[in-house]
Regions:
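Glycine-centered tight beta-turn/hairpin loop motif at sheet-sheet or coil-to-beta transitions
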Residues: 58-61, 136-138
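Conserved strand-loop elements at the edges of beta-sheets that form or border functional pockets
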Residues: 58, 67, 126
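Beta-strand/loop nucleic-acid-binding surfaces
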Residues: 61-72
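Basic, glycine/proline-rich low-complexity segments that contact nucleic acids
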Residues: 1-51, 73-231
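Short, conserved beta-strand segments within well-ordered enzyme catalytic domains
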Residues: 53-57, 64, 78
Length: 231
């Protein structure tokens, strides 16, 4: 019997495939309270995240939020209200059209789900019964006006400008997210290791398209591909 595929091993959720959450600083969620003010005490780098984090003191209670481009240590940020300034957290109906925002809630009170990558932001397009937001993908998405978001652009937008240059740096970067930096292709394996392996030739040697309902061990190659459009 052949060995399990990489996707099958990953699906069991072993420690080598799970994100090392014990090294993560905190679960980044918008504050649970509706109104308040805090002060940025520090800006730190967090393993497993592409952007730095801001350490914010809310009346003696420490909270971690995604750092916003242009903010600095000692700056005051507010929760609630209608003041439009980088780093402030407020409901979507308070934010005027054309404003850049990030860490948007999918449902009121869920803590923020959308637009959390370094350098990313979304834009308010219109407000009414639903707030329409232009997402980084280019799609327009509707949100409940009571959903909250952070005003500004996520910091760390230039992280891709400097090349990694060394395989070791790439390895350490991806390890913080439990992602491998090297992948062996199936045709280079032995037949016992992969359906595409064996045969002493660098090609699959047969059909490499699989049905959507195929068993997990068969799912190697193209899964339920669509037909190529004819011009």
């Amino acid at each position: 019997m052949g060995k399990r595929l990489r996707a099958q091993r990953r699906g069991t959720g072993g420690s080598q495939y799970r994100s090392p959450s014990h090294r993560h600083v905190d679960d980044i969620r918008l504050p649970a309270f509706d109104e308040g003010a805090g002060t940025i005490k520090d800006l730190i780098q967090a393993p497993g995240r592409t952007s730095p984090l801001a350490v914010i003191d809310f009346n003696g209670e420490t909270d971690y939020q995604l750092a916003v481009a242009g903010t600095k240590v000692g700056q005051q940020v507010t929760v609630g209200g209608s003041k439009v300034a980088a780093g402030n957290i407020t409901s979507l109906y308070n934010i005027p059209e054309g404003t850049s925002i990030h860490n948007i809630e999918a449902k009121p009170g869920d803590g923020g789900k959308f637009v959390k990558t370094a350098g990313s932001s979304a834009t308010i397009v219109s407000r009414g019964e639903k707030v329409i937001i232009l997402m980084p993908s280019g799609a327009n998405k509707e949100f409940n006006p009571n959903c909250r978001a952070v005003i500004g652009v996520v910091a760390g937008g230039g992280r891709g400008d400097k090349p990694l240059a060394k395989a070791g740096k790439n390895y350490l970067t991806l390890r913080s997210r439990a992602t491998a930096n090297k992948w062996v292709k199936g045709v280079a394996m032995n037949a016992v290791d992969h359906p595409h392996g064996g045969g002493s030739h660098p090609h699959v040697g047969g059909p490499n398209c699989q049905s959507r309902t195929a068993s997990p061990g068969q799912k190697a190659g193209f899964i339920a591909p669509k037909k190529k459009k004819r011009k």
